[in-house]
C-alpha cells in the first residue's frame, strides 16, 4: 500500500559540511523544480539532528559539532553545540532580515605569546562590509581561561565597513552601556581601523581594578564616563586595559 506520513526527521553524522555548498545545491535544485523546495521542507520536516566532524559556515570553522535544526515562523532555527560555542542561530527566510545569534557560551583558545611576538588580529583580511547583518548575544565570553562576561550587539554592514550598534557588555567589573557603538572600517591603504564611542559604568572601582590585575587601593562607586577610543585593527584588537 501507499506509505503515508505527517512529518519526518533526519538523523545521522557527516565528516564535513560547508553551508555555502549546500545553499548553492538547494538553489540549483530549486531552479529545476516547479514547487518551492524550502516551503516543502518547512511543511514536512520536523527536525534535523546531525553530528558534524568539520563544519564551515559564514566564514567560521567548527569541529565536532552537534546540530539540531527545526522550523520557526519565517526562519530556520539552528542549534549548535561543541567546545567553542553553544546556542541558537535563527536564519530568516528573508535576506533583508538579520541573522539572530543567541549563545550560552563562546570560547576562544588563547596562545601564549613568546618574547618579541605580537598578537595576530583574528579578523585580519576580513572585509567588514561583506559580513551579513546579525543580532548577537552571548551569556559567557571566554578567551583562554579568562572570563570576559556577557556581550550583545547588532552588527550592520555599511559602505565604509561595518558597525556594531546597541553594544552592551558586562566584563570584569566594567559595564558598557547599551547604545554604545563600534565602527570598523578599512582606510585607503587597506588597513583596518576601529573606534568605540559610548558610555562605560564602573559600579565598584576597587573590584574592577582587582579583576583586571591591579591593586585595589582606590575605592569609589558608580563611576560613569564617556569613552571615544581609536585603534589599529579590527574590533577584536581592542585593548580594554587602555
Language-model regions, residue ranges each:
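Small-residue helix/turn framework positions
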Residues: 3-28, 45-54, 79-120, 126-147, ...
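Blade/loop signatures of beta-propeller domains
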Residues: 40-43
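Short, well-ordered loop/turn elements at secondary-structure boundaries
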Residues: 72-73, 158
